[in-house]
Amino acid sequence: MVSDTSCNLDSLDMYVPSPENPWNVSKIHHLYRRIGFGASKAEVLNALSLNNPGALVDTLIDEALALNTTSPPAWGFWNRDDFEAAEMANDDNDLSFYRREGKNQMINDLIQNKVRERLTLFWSNHFVTEDRTYRSPAYQSQYYNLLQIHALGNFRDFVYDIGISNAMLVYLNGDENVKNRPNENYARELYELFTLGVDNGYTEDDIQETSKALTGYVNTNRIPWGDILFNPEQFSNENKTIFGQSGNWGYDDVINILFQERETLVATFICSKLYAYFVSPTCNEAIVAQMAQTFITNNFQIAPVLRQLFKSEHFYNQEAIGAIIKSPCDLMICFYNELGINDPMMDSTDFLRNTVRVLGQDVLNPIDVEGWQGDEDWISPDLLIGRWESIRFLINRAWSENPEEFRNFVVGLPIGTAAEGNLDTSLSGPQVDIVVRALVNYFFPRGIEDEVIYNEISGVFKDIDAFPPTYYEPDAVDPAIWRLDRSEVAEQFYAFLDYIVDIPEFQLK
């Protein structure tokens, strides 16, 4: 983990808007792009009028906690014979068909469900499984359901349930872990990746002894891809010593001992990952320590840690805004939600699933057991052009479907703070600069500080045939004047979006 080198010195005290540090569009997008997958124009306007970030965070988290899990598909508990019979009846219904269907459902949930699904995606990259290893689409569906159930719940319960889930048992060879041939894979990853961190608070002896305590989850009643159950005859029924505690430990004991004996290490490791994902890749150890204490105080409930973080001065510090490179899901789904794209002629869910896969983020199927590393991995040269053109595809589809919606989006857009108001149709002539500034601040997390780049963006917005340069002059008068109520503003906004896609700051959130 990188030491804290950031300039963000703010604390976890609650952020309260003030004239010196107002609640504005930038902070609203910062919250929604981190805690969810972007905000619609209506949601931004509502958040701005509320002027109470703490209450907004509580509402978003409360909604996530109250949300029902996604209903399982008809095939969510099929075994291998069921899938083979379905494929025999229809050649198109092979395993990849069901996997795509499950992933499309996740993408649809990411679009709609904000906080719960943001955490579901986060945990899928923490408790990693790969569908090409366990193969069963039903296991994938059950795993996804488990992520949703525990996304904001109790982390100790999460660790318990994930370790004996069908997908994880197969993925990390728990289903091969028997008394005379203990398999150490899951025991190692339980500590190294899921709870403690690499070489942090455990020994090789702890791994070996833990693997014995985890034996026995191997029984499928001879049903391929059926539920994997505990078989006491395959359990290592002997004394084991884990973290200095000796006894004839089994699965339940491992979890209890881990959280009793390594409480602070577990809390710190998980909170450091939450911090890196939601605030900055550069760790602030003092802030993480406070988050960890909140985690412990609340008996490893996840939601209180999130409430504390997302309400804090630290989270809304300018150094935290625009500090993270967008993942493919961030890039595509946030833009989709923020622009309010609605194209009845396109299967948006399938398009987004396939696009983020091509860009390196195949949902429910990270690249390896350590998951997607993110950050600069997302913008390697071979992926960057694909990121640009995928966003352009969305822009062009929206334009071809309803160009008028482009002007409608601009009209009424908030300028910055509630006191500054919204873009209204009375704007004309040189007031075009107000529109450009509002759009730049809306789509770039920290605006554009480089004057040359900003002027280029402004030039692109202004440079259309309908509005010669004289239309923007202070002495311009009707009909030879730019006005926000003109239909050609749609073309200006289209040109603006097409241009900003290539600007490096657009890749940040």
In which residue ranges do the predicted regions lie?
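Flexible, low-complexity segments enriched for small/polar residues
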Residues: 6-24, 29-40, 267-298, 307-509
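Exposed alpha-helical structural elements
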Residues: 27, 43, 52-56, 60, ...
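Generic alpha-helical secondary-structure signal
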Residues: 31, 47, 59-60, 161, ...
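Intrinsically disordered, low-complexity coil segments
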Residues: 49-56, 68-71, 223-225, 260-265, ...
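N-terminal accessory alpha/beta regions
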Residues: 27, 31-35, 39-148, 460-472
